[in-house]
From Swiss-Prot:
SUPFAM superfamilies: AbrB/MazE/MraZ-like. Its main location: cytoplasm. It comes from the Bacteria. This is Transcriptional regulator MraZ. Belongs to the MraZ family. It holds the Pfam family MraZ. Forms oligomers. Coiled coil: none annotated. GO terms for cellular component: cytoplasm; nucleoid. Residues 9-55, 81-124 form the SpoVT-AbrB domain.
Amino acid sequence: MADFHFQGTSALALDAKGRVTVPARHRESLVSLAGSQLTLTKHPEGCLMVFPRPVWEGFRAKVEALPMAASGWKRIFLGSAMDVEIDSGSRMLISPELRAAAGLVHDVLLIGMGNHLELWDAQRQASAEAAVLQQPMPDVLQDFSF
């Protein structure tokens, strides 16, 4: 698997059919890594996770291995997963169900998160970020040097 890392934020807009254009800076990596094959699913924080298909396969295997006590989360991650493809216009189609789950209407943000991307409603992400910034630094970051 090619070495890649998604980072940065792109402000985008959904079109009337629920499609979003994949930015050029991510498109080349997605095409070379996954042949334009992506999987989208719900994220616990109210956005969508966008995985290149090979990365999704690893994530899916981890979810499938969860114990019965996590069956609700398995249902959320696997039951809402949708396979999509980047089309000839460099767009990916977001299903109506996933758009509704993440509150995606028009203005969206595509955020690089290392091995995958997150797709957020722009206003929802701004509120989520403001809430994070109001909290004290978590213990796990106390020794992190800036």
